[in-house]
Amino acid sequence: MGESIMEIDDSRTVDGAHPLGPGQESRHCDYLAGGKVVLMRPPERHINHSCDPNSYVKTISGQRLVIALRDIAEGEEITYDYCINGDGATVWLCNCGAARCRREIHSSFFHLPIDIQLEYLPLLDDWFRGEKAAELKSLTGQGTG
């Protein structure tokens, strides 16, 4: 638990000067601090969502890492909750199969049930905490720390 599983390659920025190319899809993009958009690369592009994830993404010393939330068995699929650090408007139906599956997923952290928001607070990236400080303070009633 807490072990780094992999580093994420954020080298492919998507912007006006570097748009998505043929075969590249916006659903494979990740949205970061200050509105930066990156195209996820394999293998992290293939990490699926779960409402009961076994990992999360955190930036440490400038590098985004996939970090284990618990022991992950050999051969077990690595998953994370796409709503952690999320602030989008996308909604989709989830078929993750987890006992606590939320069925309808809103890509924004703030659409999560309050108990799950509170559970995920320690997992939030520093940039997300900074950009969403007011909303997080409102959630906890005392701030994010």
Would you name each region that the model predicts?
Residues M1-K58:
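Catalytic cores of histone-lysine modification enzymes
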